[in-house]
A protein has these predicted regions:
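Core of folded catalytic or high-affinity ligand/protein-binding domains
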Residues: 31-156
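The feature captures two recurrent sequence modes
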Residues: 1-44, 175
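Elongated scaffolding segments in large macromolecular assemblies
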Residues: 144-175
């Protein structure tokens, strides 16, 4: 039992480290340096879009996490909303694995995903999400600007469809 507790404690500490790296080395500097006013105005406009639209739901999601829009990361936040991944460190790692499997080749994915090396207990789950990404419709065509007025459920359904049954195989592997 002690081993499980030690493993859980390690995982919690590793998760806190990963979360702090994400917040203090990526999110906060980008929020500070990029045009706050213009993007804050955009976020305000999104809050006034129809309920259940991508734009409205994305604004609410960012508000709940005390985040703002960041240039270059708008599609990233959109992926959280559409794919249903949370914003905690383990969900973030799973989404990065999914995106790499789905053909996303942005440097941020690889940098953040590389932090998983300190949490080997997550590797089977990350592999499963990588496999789900490979089996799913490409999210590379999902665009922040063009889908703001679309209903969130419709967009989620469109991008969560799998090309094959390998999604079930990936989930079975994750246990």
């Amino acid at each position: 039992m002690k081993r499980t507790t030690a493993s859980s404690s390690y995982c919690v500490h590793a998760g806190m480290l990963i979360e702090n790296i994400k917040i203090w080395l990526v999110v906060k500097p980008l929020q500070f340096f990029y045009g706050r006013k213009r993007l804050d105005d955009k976020l305000d406009a999104m809050r006034n879009l129809p309920e259940n639209s991508i734009g409205y739901d994305l604004a609410i999601m960012l508000d709940l996490h005390n985040l703002r829009l960041i240039p270059g990361f708008r599609n990233h936040d959109l992926n959280h909303l559409v794919l249903g991944y949370g914003m905690e460190w383990d969900d973030e790692l799973c989404m990065q694995a999914y995106q790499v499997g789905n053909g996303y080749r942005e440097w941020q994915c690889f940098v953040f995903l590389s932090s998983a090396i300190i949490v080997p207990t997550l590797w089977p789950m990350l592999w499963a999400h990588f496999q789900m990404g490979r089996a799913s419709v490409s999210i590379n065509e999902l665009d922040f600007e063009t889908c703001m007025m679309e209903q969130t459920v419709v967009v989620r359904e469109r991008f969560r469809q799998c090309k094959t049954n390998s999604l079930k195989a990936g989930l079975a592997y994750a246990g």
